[in-house]
Amino acid sequence: MFVTPIEHAVQKRKKQKQRSVVDPVTRERQLKRNLADLEKDNFSDIRFEIPKDLLQRRVLPISVRRILSSRKTFVNYLDETPNSRYNTCVAKPSYKPPRKFCNVCGYWGKYACQNCGTSYCSKGCEVIHSETRCMKVYA
């Protein structure tokens, strides 16, 4: 079958307009997966060495000095405390809708990507998002 250049252009345009729109459940699952990856990244706390002269200038109680010089992390302290309420505390849901920020620059995200639903603010940020940050494959 012979295809004219006009028909070829129409077919090409139709293919470009077809986008894979992802349902909210898949978006939520991808968001949770990204948050879990961020939790795993840089899991160890940064250790700051306190100079001896700073500790000797001020009169600090022994308990404070012990905490400052300890190698324990915040997670270790949470594990030690019995009946820790840090992980169980919950705030009531907000009555306001969640604010949307641009995924690229952090400004107000007034537009949303049709593929993944991520917010962006301008055409330039949309181009950057579609080239580098858009999750095109959902599994």
Swiss-Prot record:
Q: Which GO terms describe its cellular component?
A: cytosol; nucleus; Swr1 complex
Q: Which GO terms describe its biological process?
A: chromatin remodeling; transcription initiation-coupled chromatin remodeling
Keyword Zinc, does the record have it? yes
Q: Per UniProt, what is one GO molecular function of this protein?
A: nucleosome binding
Q: Where in the cell is it found?
A: Nucleus; Cytoplasm
One Pfam family, please name it.
zf-HIT
Function recorded in the entry: Component of the SWR1 complex which mediates the ATP-dependent exchange of histone H2A for the H2A variant H2A.Z leading to transcriptional regulation of selected genes by chromatin remodeling.
> What protein does this entry describe?
SWR1 complex subunit vps71
Question: What's the encoding gene here?
Answer: vps71
